[in-house]
């Protein structure tokens, strides 16, 4: 069986970082992922996909990614259920992200620098002999 998801989309809001009672980091976020076709009005529509990421990756995503940023994630689809306050069974389907990659720099108005800004600039690569 294969359960593998790869998504590229924009964060609809800042990542919500929480900790379980045993202090395991868990971050929830929603990605807006454009569809590959346009509707009757010529506009591209988007799907809004709920995602969750755990542990150190959750803390890193929360620290580095902000609303509107383009990110890529890999993970799997998972369904869970719980009983709400009214005693009804609620089913939730979401993507459990295993890794992420930020695909663009943060807005220049942010007070903190991005990882890309802290990388040294080595200049162009020399011509290789092969």
Swiss-Prot record:
Query: Residues in domain SSB?
Result: 1-104
Q: Which GO terms describe its biological process?
A: DNA replication
Query: What UniProt keywords apply to this chain's record, in alphabetical order?
Result: DNA-binding
The superkingdom listed in its UniProt entry is Bacteria
Name the source organism.
Streptococcus pyogenes serotype M18 (strain MGAS8232)
* DNA-binding as UniProt keyword: yes
Q: How does it assemble?
A: Homotetramer.
What name has this protein been given in UniProt? Single-stranded DNA-binding protein 1
What does the entry list under GO cellular component?
Answer: nucleoid
Q: Which molecular function GO terms apply here? A: single-stranded DNA binding
* Entry-linked HAMAP family: SSB
- Please give one Pfam family short name: SSB
For the region Disordered, what residue ranges are annotated?
108-130
């Amino acid at each position: 069986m294969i359960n593998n998801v790869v998504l590229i989309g924009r964060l609809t809001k800042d990542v919500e970082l929480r900790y379980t009672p045993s202090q395991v980091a868990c971050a929830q976020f929603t990605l807006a992922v454009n569809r590959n076709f346009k509707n009757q009005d010529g506009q591209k529509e988007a799907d809004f996909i709920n995602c969750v990421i755990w542990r150190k990756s959750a803390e890193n995503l929360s620290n580095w990614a902000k609303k509107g940023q383009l990110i890529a994630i890999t993970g799997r689809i998972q369904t869970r259920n719980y009983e709400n306050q009214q005693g009804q069974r609620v089913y939730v389907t979401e993507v459990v992200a295993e890794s992420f990659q930020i695909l663009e720099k943060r807005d220049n108005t942010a007070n903190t620098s991005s990882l890309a800004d802290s990388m040294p600039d080595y200049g162009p690569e020399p011509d290789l002999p092969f």
